[in-house]
Amino acid sequence: MTELLKTPIHPLYAKYGAKTIDFGGWDLPVQFAGIKAEHEAVRTDAGLFDVSHMGEILVKGPDSTSYLQYLLSNDIEKIKIGKAQYNIMCYENGGTVDDLVVYKKSETEYILVVNAANTEKDFEWMVQNVRGDVTVTNVSAEYGQLALQGPSAEKILSKLTDVDLSSISFFGFIEDVEVAGVKTIISRSGYTGEDGFEIYMASADAGKVFEAILAEGVAPIGLGARDTLRLEAVLALYGQELSKDITPLEAGLNFAVKLKKEADFIGKEALIKQKEAGLTRKLVGIELIERGIPRHDYPVFLNDKEVGIVTSGTQSPTFGTNIGLALIDTAYAELGQELEVGIRNKKVKAKIVQTPFYKRAK
């Protein structure tokens, strides 16, 4: 059996009562105090996630921008220095290699933050598709990453740094910021639907920053609540809402797919064809009318015809409703449409509802 990978925070997990699981080859906390309590902490106050398992890939060189324009779906030329941008990396057929965030450090230097389980695959794909004068380096082992999320995030982090955090706009970042005496990069971003920050530092310093933030009375949060939070906010999870077989258009991520940008990007032609032909399936939100929780890969029916598949589902800790996301044949994907979800041996009534399920008050 392969030994599970561990983040630099791993030695501290037991101290805070973590229950760990194998997540994509990493030994990570699924919960600390409990998923519902952790979810509520992030929605109402703040919570701290260890996300050091995420991958970081450095792209440097005079042709970095044109290379990333070729590799990624969004318009890289629109990113200003000190800003980040959500992106999709596609295969030629329009399927998804990964979804990721691009940080622009300078005109010739970018950091791509990718999903942990995809880091090696992404890195190989990027190297395989190098164009022009660029170097691509997997620097994941050098970084620790924490996410402080929730309405109180700014107030709490402000106690540990001299930087005016209110000056950082959404998807903006500042480098060389001291947090608890440690040099960090702070980005106003996250994966919860709340305000918050993602904080990058040298791996060796991650534990110090983690404990300094928790000492301010913040709850540590595990993967269980990370999943319920992102699902309520309808943020895609690779392997569920996106995969090599699911295009970003089917997943409803059109805002990150710039089919009109001048540069050709890998998958552009296939995505243009898909859009022109009309999508045959699309991602929708569902809510169960009868008892039961929709789960990944459960079939969806209309009468006795299978018309789709659940990609993610849970009981919403915020609303108490049983919600999910499903890829549904476009003909049956209208708001209010009643469907049935196959849960074990029975069909449970559901309806298509407006998404996101949760949107924070500005």
Swiss-Prot record:
The keyword Transferase applies. GO terms for cellular component: cytosol; glycine cleavage complex. It comes from the Bacteria. Its EC number is 2.1.2.10. Disulfide bonds: none annotated. InterPro entries: GCS_T, GCS_T_bac, GCST_C, GCV_T_N, GcvT/YgfZ/DmdA, GcvT/YgfZ_C, TrmE/GcvT_dom1. It catalyses: N(6)-[(R)-S(8)-aminomethyldihydrolipoyl]-L-lysyl-[protein] + (6S)-5,6,7,8-tetrahydrofolate = N(6)-[(R)-dihydrolipoyl]-L-lysyl-[protein] + (6R)-5,10-methylene-5,6,7,8-tetrahydrofolate + NH4(+). The keyword Transferase applies. The glycine cleavage system is composed of four proteins: P, T, L and H. The glycine cleavage system catalyzes the degradation of glycine. This is Aminomethyltransferase. It comes from Listeria welshimeri serovar 6b (strain ATCC 35897 / DSM 20650 / CCUG 15529 / CIP 8149 / NCTC 11857 / SLCC 5334 / V8).
